A protein has these predicted regions:
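Membrane-proximal basic amphipathic "stem/tether" segments
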Residues: 1-76
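S-adenosylmethionine/decaboxylated-SAM
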Residues: 74-77, 88, 92-272
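N-terminal pre-P-loop "Q-motif" helix
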Residues: 83-87
Length: 272
């Protein structure tokens, strides 16, 4: 009983400290503009990942397009999505520069990233599609637990409808299922976001099959993969989880270049 009370108190203190730091950073003067995030500045995110993360966070709150902020606020409400505010700036950068026509997400949850990519495709006039592979069940892993009172597939579709987006292509399967691997192999992908099971063995399998089915110059964004890097997350962010972080360390640098980091999301591009 005492241990449970102690954990509750510690958890609430962490949330309070995170909220205080978040407000402090939001109130800093904005000293950057959109040029900070142009393609020729992405190397800064590798060299100084913590500073770059703060720039993304501040830009989201002070200079970002309102409809993209509104999208994040919608998913941040009532537990509709995880992630961090700065990640919306990450996807905006990627879509602006790389303009993916075929996008695949492994691990959809309730559709925050999948719908954001669809929204950005519309804003940027990219004639593209979005595909999601997910069990759409409250299935967790060694580091994640999910609500059991949500129909995740139906909820994802409703969230797309809320933003008046085209219906996504949703595959109800674990990424290790044959139907999922068949879908991944069915074409070539411009961009893949791996955010499914965070256990190393599963994340590695996801990486390997996706890496084999990328277009030339294709992208893999690896979630929760910045432990053991120079990135030092603030109290309102995280560095990721051990499984994806170990996987990121093992990426073959003769096949992939790391081109961008925002927080615990790391972006790798297939060398042409």
């Amino acid at each position: 009983m005492i241990d449970k009370i102690s954990r509750t108190v510690v958890g609430r203190m962490r949330l309070l400290l995170a909220a205080v730091e978040k407000e402090r950073v939001k109130r800093r003067p904005l000293l950057i503009n959109e040029t900070r995030f142009s393609r020729d500045r992405w190397e800064d995110s590798i060299i100084c990942p913590t500073d770059f993360y703060f720039d993304c966070f501040q830009f989201f709150h002070s200079g970002f397009e309102k409809r993209l902020r509104d999208h994040r606020f919608y998913f941040a409400t009532n537990g509709r999505g995880f992630g961090e505010d700065a990640f919306h700036v990450l996807w905006w950068m990627l879509l602006q520069v790389l303009r993916p026509k075929t996008f695949l997400e492994i691990g959809v949850y309730r559709g925050q990233v999948l719908s954001l990519v669809s929204l950005l495709q519309g804003i940027l006039q990219i004639n593209g599609t979005v595909t999601g592979i997910s069990p759409f069940l409250p299935s967790g892993d060694s580091v994640s637990k999910y609500r059991s009172d949500v129909d995740y597939r139906d909820d994802t579709i409703k969230n797309f409808q809320h933003f008046k987006l085209p219906d996504p292509d949703l595959i109800k399967a674990f990424s290790t299922d044959k139907s999922a691997s068949d879908k991944i192999r069915s074409g070539k992908w411009d961009m893949v976001y791996i955010d499914g099971n965070h256990d190393y063995e599963v994340a590695k399998q996801d990486w390997e099959i996706c890496a084999q089915n990328l277009n030339r110059g294709g992208i893999i964004v690896l979630d929760d993969s910045a432990l053991n890097t120079e990135y030092r997350p603030p109290a309102f962010a995280t560095g990721g989880h051990p499984g994806p972080s170990l996987l990121a360390q093992e990426v073959d640098s003769s096949r992939f270049n790391e081109i961008l980091r925002v927080g615990h999301n790391r972006v790798f591009q297939l060398i042409q």
